[in-house]
């Protein structure tokens, strides 16, 4: 069995809370020593667009989505986006 932990995020523009909490959980998994990736699918692929991610600010106790994403990536996390989902949305 793999030690990779995968968080799937399928919402961003319509429900920023889901994207925010997804990156909080993924970062916690990294902190526990798990190889961790985030898979962006359906509307979650909007998190891969910097301008869209910057609009997601859920407020305390959560940091803005862009900061959560940067922290996750800088800590060694990987982010993968669904190519067909991106294509459908013109990303």
Per-region residue spans from a language model:
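Short, glycine-rich nucleotide/cofactor-binding loops
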Residues: 6-20, 51-53
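Short, intrinsically disordered, charge-balanced linker/junction segments flanking boundaries
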Residues: 90-91
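Histidine-anchored nucleotide/phosphate-binding helix
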Residues: 19-34, 38
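A glycine-rich helix N-cap at a beta->alpha junction
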Residues: 54-85
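Short internal beta-strands
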Residues: 36-41, 79-83
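Short beta-alpha junction loops
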Residues: 42-45, 86
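Short, conserved beta-strand edge motifs with alternating hydrophobic and charged residues
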Residues: 7-8, 37-41, 48
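N-terminal beta-loop-helix "entrance" segment that forms/cooperates
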Residues: 44-58
């Amino acid at each position: 069995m793999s030690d990779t932990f995968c968080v799937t995020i399928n919402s961003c523009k319509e429900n920023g809370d889901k994207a925010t909490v997804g990156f909080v959980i993924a970062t916690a998994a990294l902190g526990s020593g798990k190889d961790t990736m985030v898979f962006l699918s359906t509307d979650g692929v909007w998190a891969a667009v910097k301008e869209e991610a910057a609009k997601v600010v859920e407020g305390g106790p959560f940091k803005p989505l862009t900061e959560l994403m940067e922290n996750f990536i800088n800590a060694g996390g990987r982010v993968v986006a669904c190519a067909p989902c991106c294509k459908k949305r013109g990303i």
